């Protein structure tokens, strides 16, 4: 089934009906990737990429969060840990948030809203996808094993792009 989904998305991409977001794909897919060095600030913390921000949520130590927020690309992705998975607990500054909660989704949407508002390159790339479906076929689908699933990621971007937030 997953193979059929991939094939379907590849066909949509090839006929210009979709964008498969991936760091190694051509514009705008690469700029929309969480790994891309798009900077933004949230709650006074400078982030070198959305990936840095997302990976920082896995650490309770605030100084470690700031350190990881300053990373982008593979360096940010490689800072990951799976420790949070056993409790489904993530952290932002002094807050403790359950990964499967509405509070988590609200927090992530707030970060993407800040990102969209502050980063012109990201915003322009996202707006250039109007009328297309967004996919991230290499993304993980199990919310218990990833900080952000393919569906969550693409839904948030679609809401931002289409002004449904």
Where are these regions (language model features)?
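Charged, low-complexity intrinsically disordered segments
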Residues: 3-165
